[in-house]
Amino acid sequence: MAKKEVVKIAKLQFIAGQAKPGPSLAGVGINMPEFTRQFNEQTRDRGNEPVPVEITAYKDKSFDFRLFTAPASFKILQAIKAKSGSANSKTNIIGTLTLAQLEEIAKYKLPDLNTDDYKVAMHTIAGTAKNMGVLVEGWDDVKKAKEEAKAAKLAQLKAEAKEAALKEAEKELVDSKGKEVEVKLVGEEEQSESENN
């Protein structure tokens, strides 16, 4: 049997059981209704999770596809019941996972990771969680991480206040250009105060 000529390999993501023909599929060059029917059939039991899929399109317009597990970020957010990760994980901790939750997510993602060891997978998932502003109890030093985040937030606020003060001073300097400015020397202020007493 001759090997089919691959025209394109596309990596897409659809909600389980809800794929529809659209622009993302049109560029792949496959029979969209047939793909969506097969995809929806195979993912119907996966709830409402996003399902990454790799589609291989062949020259004869046929196709194959491979399904993957939901993204780790989705599973982490699902575990902590959050809608999105932190915009700045260094200053904003949005939640914590238990070690059991971390292990469960790592074992779930294991088929798609480049390791067979779930403990290595746990390191990968813990790193993803940390980048999202999610700590793992018993893995991260939660108290220390929260203190560091608080200190980083305070430093960020101070830096923003300093920048605002510098911009205000710069504006005042520009506004006073060419105008007469009264300047008192420190020694003169002290002298006038002692004369008044």
UniProtKB/Swiss-Prot annotation:
Similarity comment: family membership: Belongs to the universal ribosomal protein uL11 family.
GO MF term (any one): structural constituent of ribosome
One Gene Ontology cellular component: cytosolic large ribosomal subunit
Lineage, opening ranks: Bacteria, Bacillati, Mycoplasmatota, Mycoplasmoidales, Metamycoplasmataceae
Coiled-coil regions listed in the entry: none
Protein name, as recorded: Large ribosomal subunit protein uL11
InterPro entries linked to this entry: Ribosomal_uL11, Ribosomal_uL11_bac-typ, Ribosomal_uL11_C, Ribosomal_uL11_C_sf, Ribosomal_uL11_N, Ribosomal_uL11_N_sf
Annotated function: Forms part of the ribosomal stalk which helps the ribosome interact with GTP-bound translation factors.
GO biological process: translation
Encoding gene per record: rplK
Post-translational modification: One or more lysine residues are methylated.
Keywords: Methylation, Ribonucleoprotein, Ribosomal protein, RNA-binding, rRNA-binding
Xref: HAMAP family: Ribosomal_uL11
